[in-house]
Amino acid sequence: MDIFRHTFGNNDDSFIRIPGAFREEPPADLNGRTEDQNSNTNEPTQSRDGRLKSILHFLFQAPLIVLYYLLNFIVRSSRLLKPLLRLHGFYQRKHNRLLDHSSQLHRLLENLENEAQAVTCSEGNGNNDDGSNTDSTSNNESSGVQFSFGSLYNPENGTFSKSIMQNSYTELLDACSEQVKFGVIYLHDPLLDNHMDYVNKILCSEAFVNMIRKYQVLLWYGDVTTSEGLQVSNALKIRQYPLLGIISLKAEKKIELIARVEGSISNYKAQDLEAIFSKNYSRLIQLRQQRQNIEMQRLIRQQQDSRYQDSLRRDQQRESERLEQTQREQMEREHQRIENQWLLWRKSQLKPEPSSDKDASKVAIRLENGQRLVRKFDASLPTEEIYAFVELQLHDMLNSENDTLPVYQPANYQHQYSFKLITPVPRRELDLSTKISDVSGIYPSGNIVMERLDE
């Protein structure tokens, strides 16, 4: 609070009178009045200034005090909430790990493997203390321990690692339905005194291992102290623990619990379990054959449909090609008809050969087959007249008698010559629109060579 007092308080230095000192006379002003007389005069003004300063002091001091305590509260609250948030995050991560069946399974199998090794070591040490190797062998045979738990059920390199369902109980049901196989459920209770009896005397026994191999059984392990293990236990209506249950596909996509061993290990008999597997295995074989037959029929239908679609596609392609060929032939015939009509019309428009040499051009035309034609043309006509003459000669229409009937020029048809006419010296192609008289190579006379255009 000293800072507020220093900010808004009186800036005058405090004065303490020394005891026994003489009374100091107040100094007089220029008019001869003392300070007391002046103070009496200025007292109303100082009173107003003091009240104004007090009001300003209160207005500025109160918000700053509130802000100070508010910031102090926020800082202290954040320090208290930080450990709580860390604790909440820890329990949240732990809860998420517990919900993951894969992590639960790995932890359960690891614990069972360690405890099984501990039991084996303790039994071996006890037998060595007694000095009897024969008793150790007899105890192992009586207990039925033929394999180590880790060599069988280790999720990474165990014999049955691929048969153990890594995910939820629902995955086991789906796998049994899709693959048409038996499923074995083992619910472990670590709170029991003899909770390792099932592990050592059943799960690791030679008889049980042989049954798992023979019938290609899928395995699912759970812990009743977890939420999923407890849900499975309630769904199967288990009364005692541990549980060894067998599920099988009884009908299409209908899974049933066909056998169970609960509680004391004395309730377990390997021959009874073998009888249950053997009895229901024939039913699974039938279901597998039905599935295979259905799948085979589906594949046959699929192949038939595929062959039918291929045949239909080939027929459609052949029909499409036939239609295209027909259309091309029709278009070619129509084009040939129009071209013949144009040739007849062009023959009717062809000017006769001039009788005199005046204003005429005498040219010698050599065709592609070596034939040589000599003819006179009117020099005032364009060179297209020579092109038309050669075209009619190639179609053998100059000497035909089909020009007796009137022929009209085809509408919307522009004839394209399939050759070009060239003067050899100098070598130059004749332009269709140029007058014959303007071409020095053929007027008044000259030679022309016909060449086919590249298609």
Swiss-Prot record:
Pfam families on file: UBX
CDD domains the record matches: UBX
PROSITE patterns with a match to the protein in the record: UBX
SMART domains to which the protein is assigned, alphabetical: UAS (SM00594), UBX (SM00166)
Keyword flag Cytoplasm: yes
GO process terms (BP): clathrin-dependent endocytosis; ERAD pathway; protein ubiquitination; ubiquitin-dependent protein catabolic process
Domain UBX residues, every copy: 356-455
GO cellular component: clathrin-coated vesicle; cytoplasm; Dsc E3 ubiquitin ligase complex; endoplasmic reticulum; Golgi membrane
Cell compartments where the protein resides: Cytoplasm
Leader sequence segment: none
Extent of Low complexity compositional bias: 122-142
Keyword set, alphabetical order: Cytoplasm, Ubl conjugation pathway
Quaternary organization: Component of the DSC E3 ligase complexes composed of at least TUL1, DSC2, DSC3, UBX3, CDC48 as well as VLD1 for the vacuole-localized complex or GLD1 for the Golgi/endosome-localized complex. Interacts with CDC48.
Remarks, miscellaneous: Present with 233 molecules/cell in log phase SD medium.
Protein name: UBX domain-containing protein 3
Organism: Saccharomyces cerevisiae (strain ATCC 204508 / S288c) (Baker's yeast)
Source lineage: Eukaryota, Fungi, Dikarya, Ascomycota, Saccharomycotina
Gene: UBX3
